[in-house]
């Protein structure tokens, strides 16, 4: 089943043989993809939690998952995901491409709203054995990591800078018009749905709402004020506990 479902990209199969990296690496049963898949599929919940770091880089994998959730990257838990390893034992998920991000499907059509979840079946591999177990068994750790991400760069302003200021804004509007004339205008009835221009206003709305929704999944309550006012209707001594 592994040979039919996975493709070795590097090193080239012509150089190392078709089984390298799939069943085991150079005959070593303690390395390779089959070892990881068997662990993911067959381990008990207790063993999955206890031994996860013997198979995956945990911090990296959980952050990858949260990034995919936060940006609605519906193909990046399977079809558009690769697995990297440097020693044959510890694996890292990696983006293959990111064309399904911030509401778009892989044809460039605005498809997904801001409140999508895996449980609803929107992700290409919504029932993935790996990712459903990561989601359910590491939820408390995901909450902690998500808070760290949100407070250190994974925020609306920073994402808009990367997406829009550093990239989209550098493309003149006239280029979108010329692109339309060549690619979409002659085939308007078929491709009009993906002639979105810069999609600037849509991106602003979608990204802001998606982050707020994902915050609810991981118990994050952002504060947008630098001060807090509390009114107490009593003259008695009070104690306030802030977590």
Regions found by a protein language model. Name each.
Residues 235-242:
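Short, ordered, surface-exposed loop/turn motifs in non-cytosolic proteins
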Residues 21-78, 82-235:
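Middle-to-C-terminal accessory/interaction subdomains
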Residues 1-15:
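Conserved ATP-binding subdomain of kinase catalytic cores across diverse folds
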């Amino acid at each position: 089943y592994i040979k039919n479902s996975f493709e070795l990209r590097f090193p080239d199969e012509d150089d190392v043989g078709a089984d390298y990296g799939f069943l085991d690496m150079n005959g070593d049963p303690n390395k390779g993809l089959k070892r990881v898949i068997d662990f993911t599929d067959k381990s008990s919940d207790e063993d999955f939690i206890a031994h996860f770091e013997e198979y995956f880089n945990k911090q990296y994998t959980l952050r990858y998952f949260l990034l995919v959730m936060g940006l609605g990257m519906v193909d990046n838990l399977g079809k558009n995901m690769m697995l990297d390893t440097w020693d044959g034992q510890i694996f890292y998920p990696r983006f293959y491409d990111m064309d399904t991000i911030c509401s778009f499907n892989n044809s460039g059509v605005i498809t997904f709203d801001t409140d999508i979840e895996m449980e609803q079946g929107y992700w290409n591999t919504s029932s993935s054995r790996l990712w459903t177990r990561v989601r359910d068994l590491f939820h408390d750790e995901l909450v902690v990591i998500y808070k760290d991400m949100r407070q250190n760069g994974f925020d609306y302003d920073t994402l808009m800078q990367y997406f829009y200021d550093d990239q989209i804004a550098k493309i003149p509007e006239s280029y979108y018009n010329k692109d339309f004339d060549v690619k979409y205008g002659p085939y308007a009835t078929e491709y009009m749905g993906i002639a979105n221009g810069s999609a600037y206003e849509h991106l602003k709305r979608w990204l802001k709402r998606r982050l707020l929704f994902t915050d609810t999944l991981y118990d994050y309550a952002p504060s947008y004020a630098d001060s807090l006012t509390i009114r107490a209707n009593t003259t008695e001594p009070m104690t306030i506990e802030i977590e």
